[in-house]
From Swiss-Prot:
Residues 7-190 form the tr-type G domain. Keywords: Cell inner membrane, Cell membrane, GTP-binding, Hydrolase, Membrane, Nucleotide-binding, Protein biosynthesis. Its EC number is 3.6.5.n1. PANTHER family: TRANSLATION FACTOR GUF1 HOMOLOG, CHLOROPLASTIC (PTHR43512:SF4), TRANSLATION FACTOR GUF1-RELATED (PTHR43512). Coiled coil: none annotated. This is Elongation factor 4. InterPro entries: EF-4, EFG_III/V, EFG_V-like, EFTu-like_2, G_TR_CS, GUFP, LepA_C_sf, LepA_CTD. GO terms for molecular function: GTP binding; GTPase activity; ribosome binding. It catalyses: GTP + H2O = GDP + phosphate + H(+). GO terms for biological process: positive regulation of translation; translation. It is found in: Cell inner membrane. Required for accurate and efficient protein synthesis under certain stress conditions. May act as a fidelity factor of the translation reaction, by catalyzing a one-codon backward translocation of tRNAs on improperly translocated ribosomes. Back-translocation proceeds from a post-translocation (POST) complex to a pre-translocation (PRE) complex, thus giving elongation factor G a second chance to translocate the tRNAs correctly. Binds to ribosomes in a GTP-dependent manner. GO terms for cellular component: plasma membrane.
Length: 604
């Protein structure tokens, strides 16, 4: 299986925007090379999480090895490294690109170049990959190959004279793609005799064998039973098995430079075999690791609470297990007066947060309450120290702090130019600063803005999609922290502070957000037997208030006619009871109310 000389190895990946047909093309390549028998084939073969198939997106990286007989009669080994296309997983994309020498740039022939395609193309160019443009969905009635080719040339500057026209659905053009990979993607450098260095580009947790690590051998050889050292985590392991994915795992005895494979070594947690880490031999370690390893930093935080307090231990176990397979997830215990015990969790972005939440509910059968997402703020204290705050409820008091800085992102939005006005209005509303606007083609435009991440994480994406009828796509990257006049907005329900609803907002927007919040809560909280005041406050100053009127129980129903003093007595008794109820009563706040922060812009 591994006797392929380095000169006949090709490592490549597929770059595409969501829905441009990447997974379907991967399926077709596997089928055409006979890697997967036709009878075993199922759509999105490499996306093996249910959630991936359902959403039609790639979350975890997969890899597959194919044998292809080229035009020169030689048998070539092609390694396809699948990449996630979503902005949240861009670190994972950059690692898988590092494991390749070439990339197929798949563009939908009816849609054209989109934001995420571009971001990943620039990463690929930065890694010096040979890029082969492929125009997919050429069989669609709306396909316009000429226009899209010029678009690729103008935007990315790639020569599309030899772009391949294909339809991954029907299999048209797939043999040409395989031949182009052999002809145009360079073979890996032959560094088999140098010390072992292998790049980890993915890992997942297997309950029986521990962590399974996917890697690309950059130099040297790796044999079964070798003792290896992971350079970033400084841990050593003895290999239980090594092998290749075709796409099912097949064990081999040795892998040499340029090859892609997997290893199992009874590693306990994914955090010990971090993506981007370098594997080397414990007996003869390499002098320095491969460049580009960084720790995944969570950007978006939220509270996760079980709806039933008895499920707290189950939630903790579920998070511990998820952490084994998702090194980017961070969490710590948190208690809240309104919600009881739960966890404060950190995620790479909104999609990552949604996926973790869905996996917890689906795979571990939990019912969760999720608080509104927030970002991590940098608070400069009066005594000169700096505190990082990821939970708005823990923001230090105004007198103790000097200033607050919030993370900013640089955002690029690609859209048809008829939606220019509404998109600019949206960015303006979200405290965006206009940077640049370019016409890509006569009817498509790219807008560049800098805006606070906090304004992006709530519902920016949904708003952008609904304003542009789904035509716009966006891409953002962090550009650092900036100081702003920010305040903490608390919400009081019946005089009690509701921690999960606390937010940090810009002072100019505080009144609008506060008013919107209490109005939304008035709709969402059911009426009780007593009157419930809802207030939004900054410190001790109430800036907006509403109240939910009490349900009226007619205590006079039984008095037909009769003495007025009898009625007064009953009404007085009722008033006294309500007063006591108000002092003692607890308000049941439904889950929807905690997400009210997200829904503020819905009615606009």
């Amino acid at each position: 299986m591994t006797d392929a000389p380095v000169s006949r190895l090709r490592n490549f990946c597929i770059i595409a925007h969501i829905d441009h047909g990447k997974s379907t093309l991967a399926d077709r390549l596997l089928q055409d090379t006979g890697t997967v028998a036709d009878r075993d084939m199922q759509a999105q073969f490499l996306d093996n999480m249910d959630l991936e198939r359902e959403r039609g997106i790639t979350i975890k990286l997969q890899a597959a090895r194919m044998q292809f007989k080229a035009a020169d009669g030689e048998l070539y080994t092609l390694n396809l490294i699948d990449t996630p296309g979503h902005v949240d997983f861009s670190y994972e994309v950059s690692r898988s690109l590092q494991a390749c020498e070439g990339a197929l740039l798949v563009v939908d022939a009816s849609q054209g170049v989109e934001a995420q395609t571009l971001a990943n193309v620039y990463l690929a160019l930065g890694n010096d990959l040979e890029i082969i443009p492929v125009l997919n969905k050429i069989d669609l009635p709306g396909a316009d190959a000429e226009r899209i080719s010029t678009e690729i040339e103008e935007i990315i500057g790639l020569d599309t004279s030899n772009a391949i026209h294909c339809s991954a659905k029907t299999g048209l053009g797939v043999p040409e793609i395989l031949q182009a990979i052999v002809d145009r993607v360079p073979a890996p450098p032959d560094t088999t005799e140098e010390p072992l260095k292998a790049l980890i580009f993915d890992s997942y947790y297997d309950p029986y064998r521990g962590v399974i690590v996917y890697f690309r051998v950059v130099s040297g050889r790796l044999r079964k039973k070798d003792k290896v050292l992971l350079m970033a985590s400084k841990k050593t392991y003895e290999l239980d098995e090594i092998g290749v994915m075709s796409p099912d795992q097949k064990q081999v005895d040795e892998l040499h430079a340029g090859e892609v494979g997997y290893l199992a070594a009874s590693i306990k947690a994914v955090a010990d075999a971090r993506v981007g880490d370098t594997i080397t031999l414990a007996s003869a370690p390499a002098e320095e690791p491969l460049p580009g390893y960084t720790e995944a930093k969570p950007m978006v935080f939220c509270g996760l609470f079980p709806t039933d307090a008895d499920q707290y231990p189950d939630l903790r176990d579920a998070l511990d297990k998820l952490k084994l397979s998702d090194a980017a997830l961070k969490y710590e215990p948190e208690t809240s007066s309104a919600m009881g015990f739960g966890f404060r969790c950190g995620f790479l972005g909104l999609l990552h947060m949604e996926i973790v939440q869905e996996r917890l509910e689906r795979e571990y059968d939990l019912d969760l309450i999720v608080t509104a997402p927030s970002v991590i703020y940098k608070v400069n204290m009066a005594d000169g120290s700096t505190v990082m705050v990821d939970n708005p409820a823990t923001l230090p008091e105004p007198q103790a702090r000097e200033s607050i800085e919030e993370p900013y992102v640089k955002m690029e939005i690609y859209a048809p130019n008829s939606f220019n006005g509404t998109l600019m209005e949206l960015c303006q509303e979200r405290r965006g600063t206009f940077i640049d606007m370019k016409y890509i083609t006569t009817d498509r435009v790219t807008l560049q803005y800098e805006l606070p991440l906090a304004e992006v994480v709530t519902d920016f994406f949904d708003q952008m999609k609904s304003r542009t009828k789904g035509y716009a796509s966006m891409e953002y990257s962090l550009i650092g922290y900036r100081q702003n006049v920010l305040v903490r907005l608390d919400v009081l329900i019946n005089g009690d502070k509701a921690d999960p609803l606390t937010t940090i907002v810009h002072r100019d927007k505080a009144y609008g957000v506060g008013k919107g919040l209490v109005e939304k809560l008035k709709e969402l909280i059911p009426r009780q037997q007593f009157k419930i005041p809802l207030q939004a406050s900054i410190g001790s100053r109430i800036i907006a208030s509403e109240s939910i009127s009490a349900m009226r129980k007619d205590v006079l129903a039984k008095c037909y006619g009769g003495d007025i003093s009898r009625k007064k007595k009953l009404l007085k008794k009722q008033a006294k009871g309500k007063k006591r109820m108000k002092a003692m009563g607890k308000v049941d706040v439904p889950q929807e109310a905690f997400m009210a922060v997200l829904k503020l812009n819905e009615n606009k």
